[in-house]
Each structure stands twice: as C-alpha cells, then as structure tokens.
Amino acid sequence: IISNRQEQLTKLDELIKARFVEMFGDLVENPKQFPCMLLGSIMTVMPQNGLYKPQSAYVQDKFGTPILRIDGFYNGKVTDFNNLKRLCCTDFEKERYLLVENDIVINRVNSIEYLGKCARISGLQEDTVFESNMMRFHLDDSKVNSTYITTVLCSQYIYRQILTRAKKAVNQASINQGDVQSLNVVVPPLSLQNQFADFVAEVDKSKLLVGSAVAHKPFDIEFFFKSTVQRPIKEV
C-alpha cells in the first residue's frame, strides 16, 4: 500500500513538471520568447540572511518559536510546520526574522548539490523564523506568481546559474544576496503563471487524497488526469 501511494505521489509530481513544460516550454531555450528579468527586479523585499542562535537557545518543549531549517523543506515546499525545531527568540529577533505567507527562502551555504535549495512559505500556523544558512525574499505579486517562480528556482535552469556564481570552499559552497538578485528568470504573462499555480494547487489537494486513501477508497489518478491535465490552457 505504501509503495503504491508513493508511486502515485511521484506521478503527481511528474504531472506538474509536464504541465510546466507544456505551458512555458524549456526554460533554457524559451521557445515562446517570454521576457527574462533579473530576480531582484521583481522583489519587494530584498534577500535577507536568517537568524543564527547557539544550540543552547533551542528548547525541547512547545513554548519556543519554531525555526525553519534546511532540513525542513523539499522540492519547493515546507515538509511539515508541526515538526520544526523551536528556540528562544527576543521580540526584536522575531520581528526581524519572521516569515510571512508567500515568502521564498533559498539555501545560501551548503554542499554544492544542495546550494540554492528553496521553498515557498505557505500554510504558516504560528509565528516562525528562519535560520542563518538561508535567505528570505518576497516577490511583487503584481508581476509574478510565487508558485511559478518557486518552480523556476527549483529547476536545472537556475541551478546552472547558481553554479556559475557559487564561491567554493572545502566541502561546501555559498552564494550571497547579490548572486540571488542577479539570477535570470523567465517571466510569462501573469495570467499564465496563475493558471499554472491553480493547477499545482489542484495537484496538492490530490496529494492529500492520496495520503488519506489508505484507509478509504483508492485515489483515482486516471480520473484526475482526465479532469485536470487534459483541460486546455487558456491562451493570453
């Protein structure tokens, strides 16, 4: 049952990738000739490094402030806000490092294969801060959709750009705030970005159904494919 569930989740992720290519094409070739912009030009909050606290500041109870760490997100999404580590923060630290909905966080120092790992913040349940080996920024939602941009940032197209900017040291590499602002991103019309984000939201709902299908009836991935993936894209 678990193997079948994982297989369905993998197929749903593949549907997102296929839909992205169908709507926007290969980002390197940009066959639809969408404009390219510097990531910094579509930000409303510039990249900011996160909070460093010694291990002694971390607490085992539920009374501290949750902190997002690198192991807390995967493939553009926070894995589980309920399982974040907690620590003691001052009011000033909370105000300065507080995450808000639709922020994007990106790994700034790590082994080279994980450098640039990122996630969109969605579904915050309480005040949450972010740690020092990542940066946080916020996008102009009148120009771009954060779900679309996060998908772009998770692509090989961006990872190759990060590799050219990375400062390499023994066992790790780093990027700085200027490097992130200088990344080139393909920016289609906002209406198309929003269509893609709506599709991702539908897939995410289906992932929840897959998770609950073990105790109930199996999730019908073929029906989902016919009802959503085969829906025509609205031209702009």
Per-range role (PLM):
Residues 158-163:
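Periplasmic-binding protein-like
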Residues 69, 94-154:
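A short beta-sheet element
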Residues 4-51, 182, 186-236:
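Non-catalytic DNA-recognition/assembly elements of restriction-modification systems
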Residues 126-135, 144, 167-194:
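A short glycine-rich beta-alpha junction/loop motif
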